[in-house]
Design a protein with these regions (language model features):
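Alpha-helical structural elements of signaling/regulatory helical domains
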Residues: 14-15, 45, 72
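N-terminal first-folded block
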Residues: 3-32, 37
């Protein structure tokens, strides 16, 4: 079973470009972390200020480790949150078939 994170970020009006830049910085770094199985961001074509991040980790601890990395702390908590109107994070586990 993998641990899944589905996050939705909605940028404040006029701030979508800042969020896109943060995602472009974080994605390649995050993909290299131990325990990261998949990490991909999407943007809504109908609502370009709305972003969806789909992430898979080996387990919940790998996700906690991700949130505690220097780059996550700096770019998300130290920067991106200032430009977000909304941020939701939901977690799931895969169903092995």
């Amino acid at each position: 079973m993998a641990f899944v994170v589905a996050a939705t970020w909605k940028a404040k009006p006029g701030e979508a470009d800042r969020i896109t830049e943060v995602i472009k910085i974080l994605t390649p770094i995050s993909r290299q972390e131990p325990g990261v199985l998949f990490y991909q961001a999407q943007v809504s074509p109908e609502e370009p200020e709305t972003f969806f991040l789909y992430e898979q980790y080996t387990d919940a601890q790998a996700y906690e480790d991700h949130k505690n990395t220097e780059h996550f702390q700096r770019h998300v908590f130290g920067y991106a949150l200032d430009y977000l109107a909304e941020r939701t994070v939901k977690t799931y586990q895969t169903i092995d078939v």
